[in-house]
Amino acid sequence: MKSVILDAKKMLKKEKMHEYFAKKFDLPEYYGKNLDALFDCLCEINEPTLIKLKNENALDGGTKESLTQLFCDVCNENEMVKFELVKDEK
């Protein structure tokens, strides 16, 4: 299973967050750099993939909630994708 580890500390600014997603998930050139586009791209994953989000408490509450919900929705839509939160680093 492929594992993609996302560090929330590298996703504090919206524009940087989408650049980070594009790099980590090797998203296509046409990726729209918004959460709807991210959802669409992740639903197209066709190999078993585990997405791990670490340091999620570095994100503001709204962003943390939106991303967690998005990854859970992707898991419900695409059986190839699993998601888990990784305990924060001290």
Predicted region positions:
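Positively charged, polar, low-complexity stretches
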Residues: 1-90
